[in-house]
Amino acid sequence: MSRHQFDLIMCLKQPGVQTGLLCEKCDGKCPICDSYVRPKRKVRVCENCSFGKQAKNCIICNLNVGVNDAFYCWECCRLGKDKDGCPRILNLGSNRLDRHFEKKKKV
């Protein structure tokens, strides 16, 4: 997700012990590169992202309830991108915001 949309901001704080979750729509994606191939290492999120209501949401889309554990792909683990920090997306993208206001105009 963050690879293709440059306006998305990742948390990147020191990861804790809590595992990141993905919704059914995002299930199987690597949170760094959106690859569905060769999942390897579980995603760990920071303490701020694993607290309260956010703890149960998907770490990529942040809209749906997370059901399955998130994994980094083999390539991101090989390149060391799994050690960059917490991969949770903090903001909505400009595409989603524009879509929201376009729907509001039509009503």
Swiss-Prot record:
Keyword terms: mRNA processing, mRNA splicing, Nucleus, Spliceosome
Gene name of the record: RDS3
PANTHER family: PHD FINGER-LIKE DOMAIN-CONTAINING PROTEIN 5A
GO cellular component: nucleus; precatalytic spliceosome; spliceosomal complex; U2 snRNP; U2-type spliceosomal complex
Primary role: Required for pre-mRNA splicing. Involved in regulation of drug sensitivity and may play a role in multidrug resistance.
UniProt-listed GO biological process terms: mRNA splicing, via spliceosome; response to xenobiotic stimulus; spliceosomal complex assembly; U2-type prespliceosome assembly
Sequence similarity: Belongs to the PHF5 family.
Keyword Nucleus: yes
Subcellular location: Nucleus
Domain of life of the source: Eukaryota
The species this protein was found in: Saccharomyces cerevisiae (strain ATCC 204508 / S288c) (Baker's yeast)
Pfam families in alphabetical order: PHF5
InterPro entries per the UniProt record, alphabetical: PHF5 (IPR005345)
Subunit details: Component of the spliceosome where it interacts with CUS1, HSH49, HSH155, IST3 and RSE1. Also interacts with YRA1.
Lineage, broadest ranks: Eukaryota, Fungi, Dikarya, Ascomycota, Saccharomycotina
Protein name: Pre-mRNA-splicing factor RDS3
